[in-house]
Every structure is written in C-alpha cells, then in structure tokens.
C-alpha cells in the first residue's frame, strides 16, 4: 500500500520508507493465533473465557485507540492511506464510508474473513481491521518503492531478466488472490512494490469484492481505480458489477506494457475524459509498437492476449503464470547463447534480451 491513488491520478508519492521488522512478531500475536481454536495454552483458554463466544473475523478487529495514525501517504476512490504504528510500522487504509449500515458492516467483515486467510510472499500481509472511529484495513508496511516510482519517476535501469521476474512474481501473487476468489479491482504499478528491490509485494487488495460474499451494498460499485489500467467493460459500467478476474487480467496487461515499454499507455493524450470515452467504446488500445525490439515475442503475445477488448477472450492467471514461467525458464539458455559465437546471429537481436535496460524519457500522464 502507499502508491497514491488520488482520484483517478496515475501519479503516486515518491517512495515508502518503513520497516518490516515487526511483522514476524505480529504474526505471533494473540490476534492471529485466535484463528487456531485448538490451542491448549491456559492463557488462550482464559482469553476465550474473557472474550466469550465470538465470530472468527472479530478476533482480527483492532480496538479503537490502539493504532497511532501518522503521515498521510495517499488517497484514492476507496479511501486514504496513512503510515501508522501498531506494535511497529503498519499501513492504515481508512475507507470512504461514513456511518456504515449493518449490511455494509457485515459485508466488510465477510471480506475480512477471507483476507485474514491470505498468506503469500507476493502480497502485503493483512494484519487486522478497525471499525472505530471508521472502517479501516491494516496491512504490513512495505519498505521499498512502487513499480510506478521505479519505472516512471527515477527510471531504474532494470535488466530484462529482472523485468520478466517482476511480471512472474506479480502474476504469482494475482494467481493466489484469484484462487481465494479475491478480485483486486485496482491492480496497477502504483500498487506493486519492490521490497528491497527484490520481492514483489501486491498491495491495496484489501478492498477487493469477494465473489459470493458481498452482501448487496453498492457503496463501492462506482468508477474506481486509475483509468489507464481499467478494462473497457469497467469503464462502461453497464453491468451491475463489471469487475471480474478478467478485468484484473486487463490491468495486468497494462502493467506488462509498462514493464516492456518503460512508458504509460496513451502518452499522447492528456485528456482524461477522452481516454475514458475511447477505451470504453473500443476505439483506443495501448500501442504495442512501442514495445522494445528486444522484448521476447512470447511476452508481447501474452500482453496482447491480456489486453483483449472482449473480457471472455482474455486468459486467466493460471495460464498467464504458466506462460511467464516457461519464458523465464528459457532465459538462462538465451543468455548463454547470446555470448557464444554463431554463424547465424542475424536477426537474433530481437530475442537477445539479457542486457535490456528500461531507461527512456517518460512523461507520466495525469489521467
């Protein structure tokens, strides 16, 4: 968490300083352990007697007053993110819901019931939630900059091998979320963080609508997220709920575009409403001719598949992950052959991507 989602802006704050040193301790705290009802410790039994009969998701509620809210990091259509303190550094997302109805509160707790079970190396750790003074989700604080910041602000020179690994880790995290029936709804480079420049951490999935568990409130069924990553059907908003696994796949396709071009799509259009109109009606697609010549052909094909205008024509993440893993396994062989003599080197440059660096002038779009 931490990339700015202000309105529909594509511009995030610069970086996310912080600490993850307390995460392990927090995982051992009484809150998460409460999920294991079979604990035999007398301390846990006494706590159960004190707390009485409770719903399992309630065990993750952080009482009012325990979280110290600090610096504002960014805001978006769903809420505002702050750096906070709760047994260490945490990210606190305050939701844009005032005086929630009982139905909204129950829907929120239903979602928490799924989020509390998410544990994956490529997603930010969910640590708890609060309902007072307002609904908030608390996650691990990620030390590292967003992918957006790396690509479009400081123009980090990533080798192609690293870019493909970022894509692989992102697909791996999304495949896990979808296996849990969690739709991200706002996947973008602002919400993908590189912890210590090595490990991908997907953030801001805490407001994903969980299939079959959302209880009918349309509080969040408004145009949300940044438009550059929105699938055409999401922009059109013709369906009751246009978000789907495939709309996440489209957003991932835009992330691939960022990785393989070093640019944002539609860089020649500065009018937000024009982008919404043209993408929503199928008149505008990312210009794949801007993909670098040394981008693997298989990656370019995958990108085009993810960016299909018709939702049902896009692949799902199990297939996407398998494709990227297959490509990644071919990297050592290609890397070796690139350094060996060959009588047939003509034309090889299009696939020789071991020394690719993502560094070109870019002008981030205010979309």
From Swiss-Prot:
Residue ranges, compositional bias (Basic and acidic residues): 33-57
GO molecular function annotation: ATP binding; protein serine kinase activity; protein serine/threonine kinase activity
Tagged with keyword Kinase: yes
Keywords: ATP-binding, Kinase, Nucleotide-binding, Oncogene, Serine/threonine-protein kinase, Transferase
Annotated PROSITE patterns: PROTEIN_KINASE_ATP (PS00107), PROTEIN_KINASE_DOM (PS50011), PROTEIN_KINASE_ST (PS00108)
GO-annotated cellular components: plasma membrane
Domain of life of the source: Viruses
Domain Protein kinase: residue ranges: 67-327
One Pfam family per UniProt: PK_Tyr_Ser-Thr
Catalyzed chemical reaction(s): L-seryl-[protein] + ATP = O-phospho-L-seryl-[protein] + ADP + H(+); L-threonyl-[protein] + ATP = O-phospho-L-threonyl-[protein] + ADP + H(+)
InterPro entries listed in its UniProt record: Kinase-like_dom_sf, Prot_kinase_dom, Protein_kinase_ATP_BS, Ser-Thr/Tyr_kinase_cat_dom, Ser/Thr_kinase_AS, Ser/Thr_Kinases-Pseudokinases
Region annotated Disordered, chain positions: 1-64
SMART domains noted in UniProt: S_TKc
CDD domains: STKc_Raf (cd14062)
EC number(s) from the headed UniProt entry: 2.7.11.1
List of residues binding ATP: 73-81, 93
SUPFAM superfamilies, alphabetized: Protein kinase-like (PK-like) (SSF56112)
Active site: 186 (proton acceptor)
Family, as annotated: Belongs to the protein kinase superfamily. TKL Ser/Thr protein kinase family. RAF subfamily.
Miscellaneous comment: This protein is synthesized as a Gag-Rmil polyprotein.
Protein name according to UniProt: Serine/threonine-protein kinase-transforming protein Rmil
Species this protein is from: Avian retrovirus IC10
């Amino acid at each position: 968490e931490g990339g700015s989602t202000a309105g529909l802006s594509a511009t995030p704050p610069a970086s996310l300083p912080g600490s993850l040193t307390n995460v392990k301790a927090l995982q051992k705290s009484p809150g998460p352990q409460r999920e294991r009802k079979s604990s035999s410790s007398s301390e846990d039994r006494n706590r159960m007697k004190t707390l009485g009969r409770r719903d399992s998701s309630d065990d993750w509620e952080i009482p009012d007053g325990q979280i110290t809210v600090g610096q504002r990091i960014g805001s978006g259509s769903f809420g505002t993110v702050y750096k906070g303190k709760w047994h260490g550094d945490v990210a606190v997302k305050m939701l844009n819901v005032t005086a929630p109805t009982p139905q909204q509160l129950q829907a929120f707790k239903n979602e928490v019931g799924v989020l509390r079970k998410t544990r994956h190396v490529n997603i930010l750790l969910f640590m708890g939630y609060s309902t007072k003074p307002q609904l908030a989700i608390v996650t691990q604080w990620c030390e590292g900059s967003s992918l957006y910041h790396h690509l479009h602000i400081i123009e980090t020179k990533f080798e192609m091998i690293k870019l493909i690994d970022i894509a692989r880790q992102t697909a791996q995290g999304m495949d896990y979320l979808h296996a849990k029936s969690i739709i991200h709804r706002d996947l973008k480079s602002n919400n993908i963080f590189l912890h210590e420049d090595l490990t991908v951490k997907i953030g801001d999935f805490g407001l994903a609508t969980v299939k079959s568990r959302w209880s009918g409130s349309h509080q969040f069924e408004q145009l949300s997220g940044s438009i550059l990553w929105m699938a055409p059907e999401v922009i059109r908003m013709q369906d009751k709920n246009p978000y789907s696994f495939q709309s996440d796949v489209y957003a991932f396709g835009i992330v691939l575009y960022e990785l393989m071009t070093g640019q944002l799509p539609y860089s020649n259009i500065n009018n937000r409403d024009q982008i919404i109109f043209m993408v929503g009606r199928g008149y505008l697609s990312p210009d794949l001719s801007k993909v670098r010549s040394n981008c693997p052909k298989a990656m370019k094909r995958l990108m085009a598949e993810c960016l299909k205008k018709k939702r049902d024509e896009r692949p799902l993440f199990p297939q996407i992950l398998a494709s990227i893993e297959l490509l990644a396994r071919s990297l050592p062989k290609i890397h070796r052959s690139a350094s060996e003599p060959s009588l047939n080197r003509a034309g090889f440059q299009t696939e020789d991507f071991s020394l690719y660096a993502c560094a070109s002038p870019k002008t981030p779009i205010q979309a």
